[in-house]
């Protein structure tokens, strides 16, 4: 994949060389190189935004990068979360955006059901149900000020679900992964610490270990209908894996 800054002549020349000499595929869509900072990149808002736009391919996500680079950032107010579009910060701490891709990676290609706010997939040995916060805010990338005000969410999202799964032919193991503004969000934990400009070694280790989805395990005996009651609060996502119990 090429940067949008590279001329078409150079792209064509390099593409021909790659295709002639290597068994590789060149992505035709350009990678957007942007130095713009937006604090929203660090927040849990990115979870539903990335999931929705990955599933429905509404908006390009090519502005995202693997890591923040502190040395290249200007006009920053701290060294922890600088509003850069990396899914991992400069210290190796995973942002909520990282876990959007983590949860998506657990889906299979066989889509059973799909709509705004959820997707259900099926593989040979398990179902995956991915729920995510859905409202008009995720249709286009918002600014931090549009979503948050003085550290609080302007528009609180809350939704309850009652899921009925039929044709389950055995007892079931239920594994749930949850990430949102209150659970697993490194940015929100950092806010709770008082938004320090720098982290000590101990603080860095704590934040690194704490920034992980909450995982729950449950067991359900075989029944004609498997009912799962759950909810989403704030910007976030929840993945429910259903596996036959052996």
Task: Annotate the PLM regions.
Residues 1-35, 59-65:
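Aromatic- and acid-rich polysaccharide-binding/catalytic face
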Residues 4-16, 42-54, 98, 146-150, ...:
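Well-ordered, non-membrane alpha-helical segments in soluble/globular domains
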């Amino acid at each position: 994949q090429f940067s949008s800054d590279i001329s078409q002549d150079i792209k064509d020349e390099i593409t021909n060389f790659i295709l002639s000499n290597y068994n590789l595929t060149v992505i035709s869509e350009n990678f957007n190189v942007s130095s713009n900072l937006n604090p929203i990149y660090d927040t849990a808002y990115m979870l539903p935004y990335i999931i929705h736009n990955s599933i429905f391919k509404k908006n390009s996500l090519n502005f995202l990068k693997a890591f923040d680079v502190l040395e290249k950032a200007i006009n920053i107010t701290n060294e922890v979360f600088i509003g850069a579009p990396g899914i991992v910060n400069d210290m190796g701490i995973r942002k909520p955006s990282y876990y959007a891709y983590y949860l998506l990676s657990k889906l299979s290609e066989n889509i059973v059901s799909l709509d705004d706010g959820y997707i259900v997939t099926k593989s040979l040995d398990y179902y995956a149900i991915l729920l995510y916060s859905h409202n008009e805010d995720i249709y286009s990338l918002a600014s931090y000020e549009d979503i948050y005000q003085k550290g609080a969410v302007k528009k609180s999202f809350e939704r309850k679900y009652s899921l009925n799964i039929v044709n389950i032919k055995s007892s079931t193991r239920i594994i749930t992964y949850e990430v949102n503004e209150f659970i697993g969000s490194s940015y929100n934990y950092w806010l709770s610490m008082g938004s320090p400009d720098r982290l000590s070694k101990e603080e860095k280790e704590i934040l690194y270990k704490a920034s992980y989805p909450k995982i729950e395990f449950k067991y359900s005996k075989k029944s004609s209908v498997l009912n799962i009651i759950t909810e989403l609060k704030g910007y976030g996502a929840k993945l429910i894996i259903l596996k036959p119990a052996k």
